[in-house]
Amino acid sequence: MDEDDGLLLNFAVPDVSVSSGSNKRTTSKVTGGKWKDRRKLQLSLQGRGRNQKKDRSATGKDDGKKHENDESNDSKKRPTIEPIHGPTSKMIKFSESKGEFGGKNNSYVSSLFTSNQSSSQLKVTKESDEKTYLPSNAPVEDASTFEGLGINERLSKHLTETLRFKNPTKVQKSVIPTMLSTERDLFIKAQTGSGKTLSFLLPIFHKLMMENKHKINRDSGLFAVILTPTRELATQIYGVLETLTRCYHHIVPGIVIGGEKKKSEKARIRKGVNILVGTPGRLADHMENTESLDISQLRWLILDEGDKLVELGFEETITKITNLITRNSQIMESMHKWQGLPVRRINLLCSATMQNNVEKLGSIILNNPEMISDGSSSGKHSEEVTAPDQLIQNVVVVPPKLRLVTLSAILKKISSDMSGTNNSTRTIVFFSCSDSVNFHFDVFTRGGNTFKKVKNDESGKLETVEVENDTPLIGQGTAVYKLHGSLSQQTRTSTLQAFIKDSKSNHSILFCTDVASRGLDLPNIASVIEYDPPFTIDDHLHRIGRSARVGKEGTATLFLLPGNEEGYVDGKLQVVHPKEGNLRIVNYENYLKDGFSAKSNNEDTKKKSKDPKSREGKWDIHATTWHLDIERWLLEDSGAHDKAVQAFTSHIRAYATHLSSERNYFNVKLLHLGHLAKSFGLRETPKKLGKSVESNSGIQGASKKTKKEDPRKKMLRMAKMALKSNSDEFNYS
């Protein structure tokens, strides 16, 4: 029998929707149980529970309010796709204007063409404003010849017939007669590529050849020393001397540079040299430690690229060298023997720029010098040095995220123009640091040109053999080389020679630092690209001076970032590019369109599609795909990723070393580090990259510390050593 007494109890439970929607929130005190359970129940009574959103979506009810917690949680989890209520019912994807997290290894994925700062100060140069000029450093087309300047017939014939030098340049017309007729010290200032090297080599060679009383040979002694700031420039001058000795083999040149074996250099000096080319540090070392180096008969001391010598800190070393030469000089005692040579030491200082530090070096080395500047003897020390008139200087203002694809587009365009032709061209790309050179070299040679050393069966020597002859990321028939100061001297020399002598490739590209910007006469350099801005305006002049040499045409391209860097054009470049129409502002999109506008022959793809992203041949899609391929490669290859991180951090450090006078154009605090990291193919935020660099440096530092040896292993090791010493004590075999 049911014991129901018929009593009914009614409990009034507050409605959640009503309580949440009312202005006056119902507060019910919950007691008993755990704190977490009480908190959950309290929140549910107030309509703030975690499951409220699910309940509303399940029941189809919504209070119409926007909850801050819901919005923040959704934005952190993933982008949402919401329908657009309007004339169209299409769905749009999440906007990548600020990027999004969620990539591999929790990386940050951003779009390539969004949130880019546009150029606000510079206007693109119109075609009607572009002008070209006649070469300013070309050989003089008149009746003047080398023989007419005073060079002997034998050497002049060798220059014109063998070396193909038809006429002397302006600076040669001024320097050669002065060196032949007087014995004054000279300060030579002229444009890069104007023939300064031959202007001082030819008079020295002529004087040594014309010594009649005693014929000059390797046993006669050392008569000339040429100092250069870089090993590459010393090697080049030594090569020019070797070509001159073909008409008179009795004169022997020599070279001493860092990175080579001192023992081999001492052996060559012991045999005897008449003209010695070298870098200051190695030459000073030989003067102090090589007894066979006799400098008592020295007649000429030439300092080439004097501004760079001072910049690299060789001022004290050069002073030491000159003091040693002066102390050991015996010119007065041998005047009667070498009657055709100068009766005093002649000092020459060559420089493309005139700075206070160069003038200071000249005051130390030179004695009452004569100034020769661009073909005229004048005392105008304030004269500005300018770029060659025929050089076309392009300036492209590129957003930081688009730097890498823009460089790729320029190189692709040059290679495509040269493909299928019998002509060849060379391009030099300058970077600010060696880590950046290594990274970009790996990027553009990925899956392309490879070289290996094989043993020749006949000679038994190792030879470098080319395996492939194309670079897929740039174009067929393209070879890429790299050169920087961190490479060994043997690698630097062989790389430079391979780049110069490469006749198989239609387009040869050299990625390098400023080590290749001074004095090198590289043939057929049609284009110079300054991917990273120069540290000084003088560095800019020397960089672009690799092109447009001795009257030839040339093009230089400078990359700048939007913002303060645009002021560099009016503040600095206009001074060294005074010719109207030579300095041109180019839109970076023109390069991207030329490099990434792939033409399709398919009839279906030629038809315009309603969806713009489905069009084939759209340059921005191809550029994005190219860049994403680099990013995926870095995600898959940890070694390449580490190189990219190292290149990025080294680039920032190098950027911070700009001169204080140019800091208003290149301020490291104004860089958008995130966008700049994108140009290195990195998806991590700068903060995360900084932590990874610190952790890697910490790991490297910890690995350098030697671990404490285990006592047991130490005891066993010492026991084995004692046993071995006892067994070997009477072993006389």
UniProtKB/Swiss-Prot annotation:
Biased composition (Basic and acidic residues): 52-80
Biased composition (Polar residues): 17-30
Record's catalysed reaction(s): ATP + H2O = ADP + phosphate + H(+)
Binding site for ATP: 190-197
One annotated GO molecular function: RNA binding
This protein's UniProt keywords: ATP-binding, Helicase, Hydrolase, Nucleotide-binding, Nucleus, Ribosome biogenesis, RNA-binding, rRNA processing
PROSITE patterns xrefs: HELICASE_ATP_BIND_1, HELICASE_CTER, Q_MOTIF
CDD domains on file: DEADc_DDX31, SF2_C_DEAD
Helicase C-terminal domain residues: 406-596
Intracellular or extracellular location(s): Nucleus, Nucleolus
GO biological process, one term: endonucleolytic cleavage in ITS1 upstream of 5.8S rRNA from tricistronic rRNA transcript (SSU-rRNA, 5.8S rRNA, LSU-rRNA)
Region (Disordered): 1-92, 119-139, 687-714
Membrane-spanning ranges: none
Signal sequence range: none
Motif mapping: Q motif: 144-173
Residue window of motif DEAD box: 304-307
Entry's EC annotation: 3.6.4.13
Misc remark: Present with 1460 molecules/cell in log phase SD medium.
Recorded domain comment: The Q motif is unique to and characteristic of the DEAD box family of RNA helicases and controls ATP binding and hydrolysis.
Protein family (similarity comment): Belongs to the DEAD box helicase family. DDX31/DBP7 subfamily.
Functional summary from the UniProt entry: ATP-binding RNA helicase involved in the biogenesis of 60S ribosomal subunits and is required for the normal formation of 25S and 5.8S rRNAs.
Record-given protein name: ATP-dependent RNA helicase DBP7
